[in-house]
């Protein structure tokens, strides 16, 4: 039986080995690239796959149609997911005739969702387990195939329980996988009335509330002990982390948060005292409790506290859906540079925003807007400004997958717009320069230019008309129901983190990334229809500054406006862009690590994009609205943008890959 496996972490390693031991053929393994902001104490699935000689991949979005097609070509009989962190689309789940099965770290239907290992300890459970279940669209809701119970000892902490669960998982898989291989797959429906769901835990969730019962505080310490981030408190403004503790029943009448003694170090809770066995001050080293008290300058009777409150008015909360994308991650950086903004974000990956994950004003949830509607509705209600940036926005996908473009770019975003109407929230919506279509004006005016597209049998226009229809719906909601909105239309923004060379390898990237990939790999640069199409290329820094000013919205000048954001002075054909890029490439200090230039190759758009494609000769913005509403003027020359973008991608190529 041929299997495709999605796996990560120690559980992923156990699962891969168990599938092999049961005699399955593994066609491919899909995993994640390690996040540099995460403490990777666990085993590497990618390394294990490499050692076993099994093809392994770590795509940013495994649900992308390109990857769905690749998995379909593998023709799996069965699919397994062992602690893979992203939900799999229904298209993938339906690829295997025998079904798709997930290993979950709890006794389902209890503790569905994220971090069940930590949550069972937080809640003081005495038992947990592992469950193998059939995968359906809803997370962790499919029929149960098998489960194994695990007792939780009073001295168990997150790491010891993790090891127990890994051992239980291996025993479970060793028992059930041979049976499944023979076609005998048990199926027991979950009782929805018994289901509980828990969300992702964040480092800040480790903050101790000394007014809680001592058992609650002690369980929190157990649940997030090393290598997790730890439970923490403050002495004045100094943060300290508690790595291990024990319960003392007598608080001697002290107020919660009061230091009862320093040797041993004991702190009063609501109904007892917590003895701190080991801890750490700030970024220091772990020490025993009495030494920690000395380091912190604690004395009996001192009061521990919550972090100092920030003064001034409440920060502006900005919700960014698609926060890991090109615009989303650059906008996040700009907002976090200002003290009065707090960013809430969702995306299906976090590689581009890993540098923000520990920022106290950045709150990220990994998820899919087509699945996590409850989370989105709650955060639309909670936040002040909403930016729905999720979209399929690469031309080749318009002809490859027009229905997917419509479903995501229009239908899913319309639901978000309706939430904004319902909760009366301001929306800053990304329209696109594509809505102008084949407009013949010398420069495109937001309020006067006609929006002209081709015939229905050219699916290339599905993106343009999906965005245009949303523009019109948003405008109507503004006119009829008072929705506060601004539509912005980016014109060919470029810069670091635009997309990835891997995306270019599967044909799903912007033009400049594809050109850079050709230079990196020594393949000919393809000029579609000779590369005579002209565009106005805009530096991401210029674009983000304009977008930031839209969010600031001085004097409400942006309300109800459509604003082009582009650089009319940076007009160039694709051929001119390629020539400029080649010149910068030849001058780059890393040039010697890459193959010789393979030349230009002229190709027809039909052969590259498919029969449903039409191109546009020019696309130049009028930026009068941006000047008037934002006081904004683009300033960065195209050569500077090209050089910075090229440098980013060249330095992202592995040294060994350059040499090969």
Swiss-Prot record:
E.C. number(s) listed in UniProt: 2.1.2.13, 1.1.1.305
Name the record gives this protein: Bifunctional polymyxin resistance protein ArnA
GO terms under cellular component: membrane
Phylogenetic placement of the source organism: Bacteria, Pseudomonadati, Pseudomonadota, Gammaproteobacteria, Enterobacterales
Substrates-to-products reaction catalysed: UDP-alpha-D-glucuronate + NAD(+) = UDP-beta-L-threo-pentopyranos-4-ulose + CO2 + NADH; UDP-4-amino-4-deoxy-beta-L-arabinose + (6R)-10-formyltetrahydrofolate = UDP-4-deoxy-4-formamido-beta-L-arabinose + (6S)-5,6,7,8-tetrahydrofolate + H(+)
Keywords, sorted A to Z: Antibiotic resistance, Lipid A biosynthesis, Lipid biosynthesis, Lipid metabolism, Lipopolysaccharide biosynthesis, Multifunctional enzyme, NAD, Oxidoreductase, Transferase
Residues the record lists as binding NAD(+): 347, 368-369
Entry coiled-coil feature ranges: none
InterPro entries: Arna-like_SDR_e, Bifun_polymyxin_resist_ArnA, Epimerase_deHydtase, Formyl_trans_C, Formyl_transf_N, Formyl_transf_N_sf, Formyl_transferase-like_C_sf, Lipid_A_modif_metabolic_enz
GO biological process: lipid A biosynthetic process; lipopolysaccharide biosynthetic process; response to antibiotic
Active site (record annotation): 104, 434, 619
Biological or metabolic pathway of the protein: Nucleotide-sugar biosynthesis; UDP-4-deoxy-4-formamido-beta-L-arabinose biosynthesis; UDP-4-deoxy-4-formamido-beta-L-arabinose from UDP-alpha-D-glucuronate: step 1/3; Nucleotide-sugar biosynthesis; UDP-4-deoxy-4-formamido-beta-L-arabinose biosynthesis; UDP-4-deoxy-4-formamido-beta-L-arabinose from UDP-alpha-D-glucuronate: step 3/3; Bacterial outer membrane biogenesis; lipopolysaccharide biosynthesis
Region (Formyltransferase ArnAFT): 1-304
Region (Dehydrogenase ArnADH) location: 314-660
Annotated site residues (Raises pKa of active site His) in this chain: 140
Record Gene3D superfamilies: 3.40.50.12230, NAD(P)-binding Rossmann-like Domain (3.40.50.720)
One GO molecular-function entry: carboxy-lyase activity
Pfam family of the protein (one): Formyl_trans_N
Site (Transition state stabilizer): 102
Known function: Bifunctional enzyme that catalyzes the oxidative decarboxylation of UDP-glucuronic acid (UDP-GlcUA) to UDP-4-keto-arabinose (UDP-Ara4O) and the addition of a formyl group to UDP-4-amino-4-deoxy-L-arabinose (UDP-L-Ara4N) to form UDP-L-4-formamido-arabinose (UDP-L-Ara4FN). The modified arabinose is attached to lipid A and is required for resistance to polymyxin and cationic antimicrobial peptides.
Assembly and binders: Homohexamer, formed by a dimer of trimers.
Family classification: In the N-terminal section; belongs to the Fmt family. UDP-L-Ara4N formyltransferase subfamily.
Binding site for (6R)-10-formyltetrahydrofolate: 114, 136-140
Leader sequence residues: none
Gene label: arnA
């Amino acid at each position: 039986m041929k299997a495709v496996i999605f796996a990560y972490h120690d559980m992923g390693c156990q699962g891969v080995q168990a599938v092999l031991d049961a005699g399955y053929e593994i066609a491919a393994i899909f995993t994640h690239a390690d996040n540099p902001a995460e403490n990777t104490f666990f085993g590497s699935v990618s390394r294990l796959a490499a050692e076993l000689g099994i093809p392994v991949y770590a795509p940013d979005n495994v649900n992308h149609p390109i990857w769905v097609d690749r998995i379909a070509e593998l023709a799996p009989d069965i699919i397994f997911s062992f602690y893979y962190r992203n939900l799999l689309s229904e298209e993938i789940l339906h690829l295997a005739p025998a079904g798709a099965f997930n290993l979950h770290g709890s006794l389902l239907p209890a503790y569905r969702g994220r971090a069940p290992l930590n949550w069972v300890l937080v809640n003081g459970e005495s038992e947990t387990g592992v469950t193998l279940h059939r995968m359906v669209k809803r997370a962790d809701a499919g029929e149960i195939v098998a489960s194994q119970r695990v007792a939780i000892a009073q001295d168990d902490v997150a790491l010891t329980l993790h090891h127990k669960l890994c051992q239980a998982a291996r025993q479970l898989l060793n028992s059930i996988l041979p049976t499944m291989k023979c076609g005998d797959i048990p199926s027991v429906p979950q009782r929805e009335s018994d289901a509980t769901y828990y969300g992702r835990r964040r480092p800040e969730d480790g903050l101790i509330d000394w007014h809680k019962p001592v058992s609650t505080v002690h369980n929190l310490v157990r649940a997030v002990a090393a290598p997790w981030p730890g439970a923490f408190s403050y002495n004045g403004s100094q943060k300290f982390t508690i790595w291990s503790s024990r319960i003392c029943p007598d608080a001697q009448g002290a107020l919660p948060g009061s230091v009862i003694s320093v040797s041993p170090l004991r702190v009063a809770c609501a109904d007892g005292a917590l003895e701190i066995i080991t801890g750490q001050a700030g970024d220091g080293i772990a020490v025993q409790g009495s030494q920690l008290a000395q380091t912190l300058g604690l004395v009996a009777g001192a009061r521990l506290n919550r972090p100092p409150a920030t003064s001034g008015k409440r920060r502006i909360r900005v919700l960014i859906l698609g926060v890991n994308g090109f615009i989303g991650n650059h906008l996040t950086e700009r907002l976090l540079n200002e003290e009065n903004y707090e960013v809430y974000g969702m995306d299906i990956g976090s590689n581009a925003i890993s540098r923000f994950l520990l920022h106290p004003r950045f709150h990220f949830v990994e998820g899919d807007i087509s699945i996590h509607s409850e989370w989105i509705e709650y955060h639309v209600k909670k936040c002040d400004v909403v930016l729905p940036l999720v979209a399929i926005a690469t031309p080749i996908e318009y002809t490859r997958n027009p229905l997917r473009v419509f479903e995501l770019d229009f239908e899913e975003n319309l639901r978000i717009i309706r939430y904004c109407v319902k909760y009366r929230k301001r929306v800053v919506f990304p329209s696109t320069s594509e809505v102008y279509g084949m407009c013949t004006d010398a420069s495109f005016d937001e309020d006067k230019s006609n929006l002209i597209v081709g015939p229905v049998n050219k699916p290339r226009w599905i993106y343009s008309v999906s965005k245009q229809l949303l523009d019109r719906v948003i405008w109507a909601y503004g006119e009829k129901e008072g929705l506060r909105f601004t539509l912005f239309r980016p014109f060919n923004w470029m810069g670091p983190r635009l997309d990835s060379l891997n995306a270019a390898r599967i044909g799903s990237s912007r033009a400049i990334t594809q050109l850079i990939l050709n230079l990196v790999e020594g393949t000919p640069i393809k000029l579609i229809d000779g590369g005579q199409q002209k565009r106005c290329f805009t530096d991401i820094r210029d674009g983000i500054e304009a977008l930031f000013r839209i969010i600031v919205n001085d004097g409400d000048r942006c309300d109800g406006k459509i604003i082009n954001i582009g650089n009319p002075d940076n007009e160039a054909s694709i051929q001119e862009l390629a020539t400029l890029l080649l010149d910068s490439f030849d001058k780059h200090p890393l040039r010697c690590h890459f193959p010789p230039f393979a030349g230009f190759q002229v190709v027809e758009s039909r052969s590259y994009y498919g029969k449903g494609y039409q191109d546009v000769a020019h696309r130049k913005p009028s930026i009068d609205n941006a000047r008037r509403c934002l006081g904004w003027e683009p300033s960065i020359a195209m050569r500077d943008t090209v050089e910075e973008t090229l440098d980013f991608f060249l330095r992202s190529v592995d040294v060994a890959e350059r040499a090969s």
